[in-house]
Amino acid sequence: MQEGGATAQNLLIVRHAKAESRKSWKGTDANRPITPKGAAMAFALNRELACFNPTRLATSPWLRCQETLQVLSWQTERPMEHINALTEDAFAEHPAVSWLAFREQITQTLNSRETTAICMHRPVIGGMYDHLRGLCARKQLAKQLIAKSPYMPTGTAMSLFIIDTPQGPSIIDIQKVSPIVY
């Protein structure tokens, strides 16, 4: 409670479920869907995410991210907000803009006092982790935000417990979220 746990808000970083391989997919990367195994992963993960009761769902507009949160969106009747700056291409072109878009989600989460789930791609997650490590209240927390790829396995999430301080947002705890069975 000393760190402000009673006032902490949750922000869930979700890595999309297993997608079709880039090699075998003939369409655009933005339209690359999740596999049947990925659909099972997403279904199982969404049951775990529901335990955090995310009332705001945000996602890269790319299909595999949307498909990962789709069941949760349908079951909770909550819309998904598409954030263009969180696509792989947008991050590759303008990583600072991607961080600002993600940082805005942190601000909205703290201001609205609602749990947010954000589905993103591996390289984008790595870039966000680079910034998030600096927001961690303790070094041991920062170490949980892995500094090398793949950062997180597909179809898993990290729950960040964030408080608002006079110096800005501070991450006071991190929990890994992964389905037991899929």
Identify the role of each PLM range.
Residues M41-A44, A101-Q105:
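Well-ordered alpha-helical segments embedded in enzymatic catalytic cores
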